[in-house]
Amino acid sequence: MTRKNIDLIEMEGVVTQCLSNGMFRVKLENGFLVLAHVSGKIRRNSIRILLGDRVAVELSPYDLHRGRITFRLRPGSKT
């Protein structure tokens, strides 16, 4: 099921805190702190997200304090 009607905001950030049940505190590029959970594809492929990792986060325009981690960026990559 895809969400084509809702325009999601995609940003990059750094994981600052690892919480329980696949939840993470992420500091975005603009300085905001959001609570983000791991997307299903990352969970299914057993991709580990650790403290200090750069990640791509999707935010809903309705709640800018919660997000979904959609991609773990490689170390040293700019995008």
Swiss-Prot record:
Keyword RNA-binding assigned: yes
Broad class of where this protein is predominantly found: plastid
Localization, UniProt: Plastid, Chloroplast
A GO molecular function held by the record: rRNA binding
PROSITE patterns with a match to the protein in the record: S1_IF1_TYPE
Family: Belongs to the IF-1 family.
Name of the protein: Translation initiation factor IF-1, chloroplastic
UniProt organism field: Chlorella vulgaris
Gene of this entry: infA
